[in-house]
Structure formats: C-alpha cells, structure tokens
Amino acid sequence: MNKKTLLVIFIVTLLIADEVNSFKFGGFLKKMWKSKLAKKLRAKGKQMLKEYANKVLSPEEEAPAAVPAGAPERRRR
C-alpha cells in the first residue's frame, strides 16, 4: 500500500477509537493478562527461566567422553 492509503487508514482508525468512549485500554490489558493463553505463556516462561537459572548457577559436570570404540576385530578364515 502507498503512504496515502496508510495515512487514511490511520486517521479513520483514530476517529473510530475516539468515538468509542466505552473502550478502555486498561480494561483491555487486564482481560488479556487474565486470559488462559496468557497464563499458559507466563507459566511456560517461568519454567524456562528456572531451568536456565539452574543451568547457569549450577552447571552440571560434563560426563566423561565415551571411550572411542577401537577398530572391530577381523575374523580369521
């Protein structure tokens, strides 16, 4: 879209938002914060943060490297 079209859409959106007096942004944010999806995302974020903190604060000892397998024994005929 060109700039004029975007400007018209922006102005119309502002006019509509100005006319809707019952819409309160704070109430909208509150509803979003209490939604089930937001709760799931916050829980997942907390879990990931805890896992990261545990990994950073107490790094696990590196497991000893596996002993490389030698060349397989050849069968005698």
From Swiss-Prot:
Localization annotation: Secreted
Any one Gene Ontology cellular component term annotated for this protein: extracellular region
Keywords: Antimicrobial, Cleavage on pair of basic residues, Hypotensive agent, Secreted, Signal
Propiece residues: 74-77
Claim: Secreted is one of the keywords in the record: yes
Distribution of this protein across tissues and organs: Expressed by the venom gland.
GO biological process: regulation of blood pressure
Cleavable signal peptide: 1-22
Major location category of this protein: secreted
Family, per entry: Belongs to the non-disulfide-bridged peptide (NDBP) superfamily. Long chain multifunctional peptide (group 2) family.
Free-text function comment from the UniProt entry: Antimicrobial peptide. May also inhibit angiotensin-converting enzyme (ACE) and potentiate bradykinin (BK).
The name this protein goes by in its record: Bradykinin-potentiating peptide
Organism: Tityus discrepans (Venezuelan scorpion)
